Amino acid sequence: MDLPGPIHDILLVFLGSGLILGGLGVVLLTNPISSAFSLGLVLVCISLFYIPSNSYFVAAAQLLIYVGAINVLIVFAVMFMNGSEYYNDFHLWTIGDGFTSLVCTSILFSLITTIPDTSWYGIIWTTRSNQIIEQDLTSNVQQIGIHLSTDFYLPFELISIILLVALIGAIAMARQ
């Protein structure tokens, strides 16, 4: 996606702030359902980070797999939990929480001071040119799309129906 510089920066700041707010929601919200939906926001923001870098297939795969499947399973699992047994001995702040926050804060500040000083332009990511890699990725994505929509269409749809039936069966068994 060819965006002008300021719009690209604003988009990245918006996605980054959504990612940070969603991560804080996962950690700080006490209601498990709200925490699971915050995790969904985090996963959506992560998948949207791939769109400005022209990785549309990876963004769509992230949305389908993580948001569409994993997060839905987490929400179902949270809905079937008995919430009263988890809130009986709830302490607001423990020694382990303080130690963990100290370690995470020190790692955050070390990353904040290290990343701007690192010269990223001298790092050789690959030995091949970027054009060849982009052509390979484009052809691979096109090949995957062609095979999924022609050769493997019926098995792909059958597997999705089998997974849907298994999920509904698991929910029905958990209800009883």
From Swiss-Prot:
Membrane topology of this protein: Multi-pass membrane protein
UniProt catalytic activity: a plastoquinone + NADH + (n+1) H(+)(in) = a plastoquinol + NAD(+) + n H(+)(out); a plastoquinone + NADPH + (n+1) H(+)(in) = a plastoquinol + NADP(+) + n H(+)(out)
Cellular component aspect of the GO annotation: chloroplast thylakoid membrane
Keyword terms: Chloroplast, Membrane, NAD, NADP, Plastid, Plastoquinone, Quinone, Thylakoid, Translocase, Transmembrane, Transmembrane helix, Transport
Annotated GO MF terms: NADH dehydrogenase (ubiquinone) activity; quinone binding
Membrane-spanning intervals of the chain: 10-30, 32-52, 61-81, 92-112, 152-172
Top-level taxon in the UniProt lineage: Eukaryota
InterPro entries registered for this protein in UniProt: NAD(P)H-Q_Oxidoreduct_6, NADH_UbQ/plastoQ_OxRdtase_su6, Nuo/plastoQ_OxRdtase_6_NuoJ
Compartments it resides in: Plastid, Chloroplast thylakoid membrane
KW Membrane (keyword) present: yes
EC number: 7.1.1.-
Subunit annotation: NDH is composed of at least 16 different subunits, 5 of which are encoded in the nucleus.
Biological role stated in the UniProt entry: NDH shuttles electrons from NAD(P)H:plastoquinone, via FMN and iron-sulfur (Fe-S) centers, to quinones in the photosynthetic chain and possibly in a chloroplast respiratory chain. The immediate electron acceptor for the enzyme in this species is believed to be plastoquinone. Couples the redox reaction to proton translocation, and thus conserves the redox energy in a proton gradient.
Family annotation (PANTHER family): NAD(P)H-QUINONE OXIDOREDUCTASE SUBUNIT 6, CHLOROPLASTIC (PTHR48479:SF1)
Entry similarity comment: Belongs to the complex I subunit 6 family.
Name the UniProt record assigns to this protein: NAD(P)H-quinone oxidoreductase subunit 6, chloroplastic
